[in-house]
Amino acid sequence: MSGRIVIVGGGLAAGSAAAALRDAGYDGDVVLHAAEPHLPYERPPLSKGYLAGEKDADSLLVHPASWYAENDVEVRTGSQVERIDVDAHTVTAGGATEPFDRLLIATGASPRHLPAADESGAPVAYLRTREDSDRIRSALAPGRRIAVLGGGFLGLEVAAAARTAGAEVTVLESLDLPLLR
């Protein structure tokens, strides 16, 4: 099978999709657009080992840089896809338009921003990227007071990392108990 497959995304799904294509014998062009300036990486450690300083950035990578070169996967980091034209079979990134035969969108989700928190004047951090985790880690210190909005897995993992760093933590959850969703 040949042609050009464009993958939009920079996380585990995007990196794994590129590997699955090559493992299945796909010999066409594979181009991966990652909006962040990094090779595709796993996001779950951002709220656990990476946030706690137990893992480094290289340990998050889905594949090392050499894998992409060896498997003829073109990775464009810092490449935000701004437009997809499914009728013309094109994507536009950085003002440049390129064709595709098949398109895989593996962008994941974005955190829900809370206007009241954003407008409060208090320092607010959201966790989605490596840089977000770095910012949160820099705020974690003994005696710091941290409020975590949300009692789901991510919120509780961030709270645990903050406590491990010696911060005082309050978890705010709209439901009666954490982990109910």
Please annotate each region the language model reported.
Residues 113-114, 156-157, 180:
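Glycine/Thr-rich phosphate-binding loops of Rossmann-like dinucleotide-binding domains
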Residues 132-135, 154-158:
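Internal, well-ordered alpha-helical segments in soluble enzyme and binding-protein domains
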Residues 148-149, 172:
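Hydrophobic residues in beta-strands of the RecA-like P-loop NTPase core, especially within AAA+ ATPase
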Residues 36, 109, 152:
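Flexible, active-site-proximal loop/turn residues at the rims of small-molecule/cofactor binding pockets
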Residues 9-12, 128-129, 149-154:
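Glycine-rich Rossmann-fold phosphate-binding loop(s) that bind the pyrophosphate
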Residues 1-5, 61-147:
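FAD-binding core/adjacent interface of flavoenzyme oxidoreductases
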Residues 2-74, 159-181:
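Beta1-alpha1 glycine-rich phosphate/pyrophosphate-binding loop at the start
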Residues 38, 82, 156:
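Glycine/alanine-rich phosphate-binding loops at beta-alpha junctions
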